[in-house]
Amino acid sequence: FIRNFTHKIVQSGLFVLFFAELWERFCYYGMRALLAVYVAEQFTQGDRSAASGMYGAFTALVYALGFFGGTIADKYLGYRRAIIVGGVLMAAGEFMLMIPTEEMFLMGLAVLIVGNGLFKPNISTLVGKLYKQGDARRDGGFTIFYMGINLGAFLAPIACRWVAGVMGTGGKPDYRWGFIAAGIGMLLGVVTFWRGFAALGDKGLPPKGREGMSSILVVLFGGLALAPAVYMLLAKAELAGYVTLALLIGILLYLIGYGLKSDKVTFQRILALIILLIGNIAFWASFEQAGNSLNFFARDQVKWESTDNFPLGGTRGELKAADAQSVTLPVGFARALDGAKASAVNITVTYPSPENVNIKVDATAELAS
């Protein structure tokens, strides 16, 4: 069964897209895990508000440019070439983040944003192109594809932060090496995708009349020409907010206009898409706190001490509160304790000294029936 299942994945090209997207998400989430904290420490003299503004502008522009990347692939490049060009630009942007000047850092982010706009929407579309409408394997294919996304996003913060810690000096991480690790991951994704062209068959080829290299060069240089405009928006985070809002309104009007000109079924699908987009705004605004406010909270309130270089704090990792000698952790799920069913558990850890650690467990419990 496993051999037949794997054979179908490889033959369909899903294997190639799985690993290409895994490495692209490794690149993005590895960089994102370090971005806000690095900006605060390197460029804003510890000002979280300014660092958060730049982070917000970055994420807003990442999502906004995906719309244009998909349009360019449809009309000019085709999905394959858009993915390759986007991946190369993302890797180049990551490597530019290594340069410790604010100007080059912002330009690196701008190049990365343009590259992500070409890569991200088109590889997801290419997964859909692998299956005909109504194919029973379609849902399973997207499930496997999203497993690659989640795996890359899970591994990236651990690996990139570990590299930054290993390459740092004086107990302080050098986040620039984390960006390098993310860029190398992106290059691995590009190579994986390029080497797997044969498994994709005729999927993702450029439109007729656009097969030459001229389309690639136009988009590549056009993307590089767009980077300075993105740079300006990153440098002026408040302006980026207004521009992103204008883009959102423009995209919504475009979709509505396109739907009104189309048949009834297409219009209904576009209307459903718009409703989902409204919900998505609230979700992603909350989700992106993982790379922003939650990152600062983890940095300031949690400290890992280790005797070795193991990524998660070593075999003797000691979790300490930053400004206290005790921490209470509420656990909001049922847990069996000595025959009782606990509805809430408070775990208090006190450590007057590293050699004297006390753990006290208080539980609100009911007798198990």
Give the positions of each predicted feature.
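Hydrophobic core of transmembrane alpha-helices in multi-pass small-molecule transporters
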Residues: 22, 93, 104-122, 273-281
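A membrane-interface helix-boundary motif in multi-pass transporters
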Residues: 47, 162-184, 230-243
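Central cavity-lining transmembrane alpha-helices of secondary-active solute carriers
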Residues: 55-75, 120, 151-156, 184-187, ...
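Cytoplasmic membrane-interface "Motif A"-like loop-to-helix N-cap segments
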Residues: 75-87, 134-135, 266-267
